[in-house]
Amino acid sequence: GIMGDILNMYGLFPCKIKAGVFAFCTRGTIRVTINLDEHTARANDFITLLPNTFIQIHEVSEDAEVCFVAFSSRFLESINFIRTISNLIVTIIENPVVPLSGNAAAIYKDFFSLLVRADNAPDSILFTDSLKPVLDLLIQGVVNMYRRFNTWKEPVLSRDKEIAREFVQLVWQYYTKERSAS
């Protein structure tokens, strides 16, 4: 996993992440702005960052540790990632940090530990062909996670935010329609 001191290096400026990132906070806290909304990730929180997300880390506790896996936007396009999660996109954008139950957190901790072991082994089994099933597991986990978690923050939206939300939904609908036609 990535430790707090390395995470602090990303706090100097906001950056755009082109990849899709699935992360799991194993300990500590991280105060971060994701697409202009501030969040705090704590131990046992799962973080989903869609491609082209803007992120800035503000504060990281000394004991913070995050495990993550990132997939290039090209790889995600090749497996129709956006179509798979299309009905959850706005929810994911508005709620990128999800607290997990103890049991689910233990499973994700084991999952990420296994990925690290597989990647660091001299005879690594992680190749492009083997990454699709890994991504499939993560996607299904995220879909189930977002369907089960029903206490999403529903902020009182200003008219500007309401228009922006509707615009994002329309853009994603158009994107998935265009991608399915090709």
Locate each region found by the language model:
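Generic protein-terminus/edge-of-domain signal
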Residues: 1-42
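Short hydrophobic beta-strand segments that form the core of ligand-binding sensory/regulatory domains
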Residues: 21-23, 66-70, 90
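Conserved metal-binding segment of the jelly-roll/cupin
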Residues: 41-54, 70
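Ligand-binding loop in jelly-roll beta-barrel domains
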Residues: 53-74, 80-82
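Double-stranded beta-helix
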Residues: 76-92
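Amphipathic alpha-helical segments enriched in hydrophobic/aromatic residues interleaved with Lys/Arg
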Residues: 90-137, 141, 145, 167
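Short, Lys/Arg-enriched, Trp-marked, Pro/Gly-tolerant hinge/linker segments that flank
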Residues: 100, 123-130, 143-181
